[in-house]
């Protein structure tokens, strides 16, 4: 099953790619590689969601925000390539959690 068909089957609608908050592009293609700009969680109105996991943000809310970021990345990928079905392999992904120093529930 294709990636696009799977999203449709799951009823997942990808969000709009967030507008850059500085002078950068949401993606760059170099040869046959796609590089995506970093993403942070945003609400349905595009407002940046902040806070530290383990303090202002619960683990459950952090999972919800991580899902939002994942969908934003898929949306940026679709914008860059025209279809998620053009993705062959993910070579590297860096993920960061803004958490309190003693957070251990990764």
Regions found by a protein language model. Give the residues of each.
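Short, polar/acidic, helix-capping and beta-turn segments at strand->helix junctions
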Residues: 1-106
């Amino acid at each position: 099953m294709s990636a696009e068909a799977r999203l449709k089957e799951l009823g997942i609608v990808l969000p709009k790619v967030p507008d850059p908050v500085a002078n950068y592009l949401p993606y760059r293609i170099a040869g046959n590689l796609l590089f995506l700009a970093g993403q942070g969680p945003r609400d349905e109105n595009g407002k940046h969601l902040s806070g530290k996991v383990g303090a202002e943000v619960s683990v459950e809310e952090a999972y919800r925000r991580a899902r939002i970021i994942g969908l934003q990345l898929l949306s940026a990928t679709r914008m860059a390539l025209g279809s998620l079905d053009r993705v062959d392999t993910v070579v590297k992904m860096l993920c960061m959690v803004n958490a309190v120093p003693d957070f251990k529930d990764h």
